[in-house]
Amino acid sequence: MCRVQGMIEEIVNRLRGKLIVSCQPVPESPFDNVASVVAYARAAEASGASGLRIEGAANVAAAAQASTLPVIGLIKRDLDDSPVRITPFLEDVAALCDAGAAIVAVDATDRRRPVPAAELIGEIKRRGRIAMADISTLAEARNALAAGADIIGTTMSGYTGEGPTPKDPDLDLVAHCSRLGSFLIAEGRYNSPQQAGEAIRAGADAVVVGSAITRPEHITGWFRDAVESAAKPSSPVLAFDIGGTKTLAALVRGREILERRVMTTPASVGSESWIGAIASLSADWQGRYQRAAIAVTGRVDGEIWSSLNPETLAIPPDYPLGRRMGAALGAPVEVINDAQAAAWGEYRFGAARGRDMVFLTISSGIGGGIVLGGRLIRGARGIAGSLGQVLVAGPSGFVRLETLASGFGIAKMALEAGHAGDARSVFSAAAAGEGWARRILLDAASQLAAAVAGLQAIVDPECIVIGGGVGMADGFLDMLREALGSHSAVMRPDIVAAELGADAGIIGVADLAATYFS
């Protein structure tokens, strides 16, 4: 007994925190022979694996002879009167022990079976081997340990029910079983290094990986499906960009806008007539899309749309825009803040092209979006990137940045200086050499420069992309860069002009719906 216990401790210590490779070829494949299994075993050992899982007594015997790694042995059978396949008979246990398996795996699920799992575990122990129980539930793990199993494997999770096999491994089962105190091996659908690492972090002592290493038929299929799916033209996305004055509807595929329509944004935001008017813009496109997406000004938190600045657009409180538009369109609808959507568009197809970035749109107001590590950062409250809402010191106290540096802010400062008109007229006056106009624009650029320097310090993106009617107006980026000259070099961001223009939001929101949220 002491000798057996010592062997158990020695082997589990060799496996703790290590990779076990399952060398089980696809049945009747070109690799379904003893020589291939031995080659797999040798390659696994040479590459740093610490254990092998092998099916069939002949394969176990050959691998145990060719490798110094401990072998988990099993025999698979297809029975007419039982769904249990892994080592269902006592004679299977005997054959595996005689073949040299250090560990014998048995199906320990709670299903109809020819021999109780407890008897199989007892026979493994009687023969001086380590008993591994392949289970699918926490209750089965507890029963197997009560029967004397030395190792629990999550092998059967997802393979005992009536429904389709899950795509991902059962990390929840790993976490629950890790609290039982026995040696735990995570197994089943670990098809990436990331998933294997997650299993260890979830509490597994070791991880078995099979198909992703030793089944080229499966690996080829994964890559084939990914390539063919990417090459296949996707269905267009129905996308809307709803602004305070106009609404754009378009069918979008990738960065290509296939068709577009524009209308004046209806009054009575959120009313049934408002929903109906916007939905009617795309009525004859029914059947050409499967998903829809909406870019809107304001705050989007989950499915709830609300105002960040009611002066820009008055939105009914806690308005479920996605649900209302989804019902009208008969399709699932994603709703994204328009500046965040534009940030994604510029990241995917525009000025940033895959770089960590912040996008700022400077027009009637100031909005923004952040993309880091390939992810759109929406934030806990849906307001990430909303630089225009940051409070800054104004002439008479703290005000929103967009009050001073947006199109509305520029027009207001011009009016206070005795010059009525909009931001466009201020730019025209500055271009004509009017000193008052240039001072207003330089002041706006200075306020914005201080804010983006702070943004660089907080987010530290590779670039800050500037768009919007004010941001792209002649000379404004030069003024912004000039104002940034008063800040230290490390705080001066790489300022680049947006490339997608007014289409950034609708392209971005469509791509998010097609790829990011699908």
Swiss-Prot record:
Region (ManNAc-6-P epimerase): 1-234
This protein's encoding gene: nanEK
UniProt xrefs under HAMAP family: ManNAc6P_epimer (MF_01235)
GO CC terms of this entry: cytosol
Keywords: ATP-binding, Carbohydrate metabolism, Isomerase, Kinase, Multifunctional enzyme, Nucleotide-binding, Transferase
One annotated GO biological process: N-acetylneuraminate catabolic process
Reaction equation(s) it catalyzes: an N-acyl-D-glucosamine 6-phosphate = an N-acyl-D-mannosamine 6-phosphate; an N-acyl-D-mannosamine + ATP = an N-acyl-D-mannosamine 6-phosphate + ADP + H(+)
The protein's name: Bifunctional enzyme NanE/NanK
Organism: Brucella melitensis biotype 1 (strain ATCC 23456 / CCUG 17765 / NCTC 10094 / 16M)
Pathway: Amino-sugar metabolism; N-acetylneuraminate degradation; D-fructose 6-phosphate from N-acetylneuraminate: step 2/5; Amino-sugar metabolism; N-acetylneuraminate degradation; D-fructose 6-phosphate from N-acetylneuraminate: step 3/5
Family, as annotated: In the N-terminal section; belongs to the NanE family.
PANTHER family linked to this entry: N-ACETYLMANNOSAMINE-6-PHOSPHATE 2-EPIMERASE-RELATED
GO molecular function, one term: ATP binding
Residues that, per the record, bind ATP: 239-246, 365-372
ManNAc kinase, as annotated region: 235-518
One Pfam family hit: ROK
Function in brief: Converts N-acetylmannosamine-6-phosphate (ManNAc-6-P) to N-acetylglucosamine-6-phosphate (GlcNAc-6-P). Catalyzes the phosphorylation of N-acetylmannosamine (ManNAc) to ManNAc-6-P.
The enzyme's E.C. designation: 5.1.3.9, 2.7.1.60
